[in-house]
Amino acid sequence: MKKVVDINWLEQHLDDPELVILDASQSTSVNKQENAIQGKYIPGSHPFSLQEFSDQKSELPNTLPTPEYFERKCRDLGINSTSKIVVYDNAGVYWSPRVWWLFHVMGHEEVAVLNGGLSAWIKANQATTESLSQANQPGNFKANFNKELVKSIQDINQNLTSQSFHVVDARSKGRFDGTAPEPREGLKSGHIPNSLNIPYEDVLNEGYFKSPDKLKELFKHTSSEETLTFSCGSGLTACIVSLAHSLISDKISPVYDGSWTEWAQSGSPINTKES
């Protein structure tokens, strides 16, 4: 299954009994901006709340749940081990790559993001519905945790010395340089030492992933042999850039799950443009 599919692909596969469509839309973005499309869904979509599919006991936002919890929630949605999953959101491409990454972490590779999201579907005059679907019966989804796709703060700290992988930060240049504030109150801006900045907005064009040639240009300072790890503010937009990289490298790189929210409040080293 392709990592990213377009509306034509989805339209042609709507009758596939193995297809599961997940709506990962949110009413507001991380910076509190209201998303334009509300109350419209692709027919047959099931609700996928990133808040529900996160560690409910963590003080950090969006962190990974346990495999057992993830498995149970997926079964509640009627997802099977053989399901072909397409996920979309109402912000073009924003929330959905996190869901794509979550399924890969949990061992399910038959998952794709809808390029352009719900807005692309609506612009193509495709039918929408005002309600989400519920599962007719529980699924048999089985989680198989892939630890290779997740980095912890301990891994990142050890890498400051070992330099075994390169951290790519998906936050804005201002936040990375330490010249713009973080959206989360009390967090200092800046970046993990020796990291590279590729803002998530740079891999997108009006809610669609840029062409492979343009993505390759963005990653020109990394080599195909180099191991990358993606980070951002809370592990969300890092998944957008991770997915973009996978489109040109044919491999899926890990994400630092705690990301800057964890790093900046941990006492770990912080670099800025001036340091």
Regions found by a protein language model. Name each.
Residues 1-275:
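Cytosolic catalytic domains that perform sulfur/thiol-centered chemistry
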